[in-house]
């Protein structure tokens, strides 16, 4: 059987249990020119919250009673004369939150799991990594010597964005929650410093680590942290942010 997660209603604020329904259906058979894929991993991305809102955005919303959209990586276990993929190929693309799915291959790409672990293709080499790469380079337009602040620094996007900024010769300050995450951000990821928003005052931390102000802020969280970062900007510099999903600043 094929377990699938269906969208049952559009949430207001945070999704709740009745937003979804877990169902079991027969494993589908691939039609002519299709393949059957067994899902190994699903990419859980913040963008998924936006996909279940009503109304068109940069992408059509997930329809009610449809399988929840998600990036996946899996192995082809059956082919019906597919011109490009064969049984045993590992592919990544839009597979949805389900154990098996069929596809024509449109929007899917074969990956080489001998180069890096499979999960990297839905992490640093997938949507989170691409968000970080294009956000920090194309939107933030960082340059050597910039002071860059990254919120959500221990997360999938923030961790990659910060490392790219370090490679470009920037001074990089992270914001994360808790001493363990901050230690990881500095000691493992190579950030210059990290502000623990759970135990430190953000404004004081920014004054300590960015006394001359910020050049670029990569915002992953919004809210009060965004407010503090905006107050620390050098005049005329850049703030690039990901979308707010379920929470908003009160001022």
Model-assigned labels for residue ranges:
Residues 79-84, 174-184, 198, 202, ...:
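Short glycine/proline-centered loop/turn elements that form peptide/ligand docking sites
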């Amino acid at each position: 059987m094929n377990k699938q997660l269906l969208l049952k209603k559009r949430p207001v604020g945070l999704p709740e249990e009745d937003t979804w329904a877990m169902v079991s259906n027969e494993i589908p058979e691939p039609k002519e020119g299709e393949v059957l894929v067994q899902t190994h991993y699903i990419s859980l991305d913040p963008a998924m919250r936006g996909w279940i809102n009503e109304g068109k955005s940069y992408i059509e919303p997930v329809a009610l009673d449809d399988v929840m959209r998600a990036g996946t990586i899996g192995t082809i276990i059956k082919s019906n004369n597919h011109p490009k993929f064969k049984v045993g190929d590992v592919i990544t693309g839009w597979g949805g939150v389900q154990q098996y799915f069929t596809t024509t291959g449109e929007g899917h790409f074969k990956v080489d799991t001998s180069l890096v672990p499979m999960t990297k293709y839905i992490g640093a080499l997938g949507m989170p990594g691409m968000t970080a790469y294009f956000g920090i380079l194309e939107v933030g337009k960082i340059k050597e010597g910039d002071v860059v602040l990254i919120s959500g620094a221990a997360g999938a996007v923030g961790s990659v964005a910060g490392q790219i900024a370090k490679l470009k010769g920037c001074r990089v300050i992270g914001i994360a929650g808790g001493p363990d995450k901050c230690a990881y951000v500095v000691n493992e990821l190579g950030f210059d410093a990290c502000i623990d928003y759970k135990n430190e005052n953000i404004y004081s931390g920014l004054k300590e680590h960015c006394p001359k102000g910020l050049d670029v802020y990569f915002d992953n969280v919004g809210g009060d942290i965004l407010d503090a970062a905006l107050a620390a900007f050098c005049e005329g510099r850049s703030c690039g942010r990901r979308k707010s999903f379920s929470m908003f600043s009160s001022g």
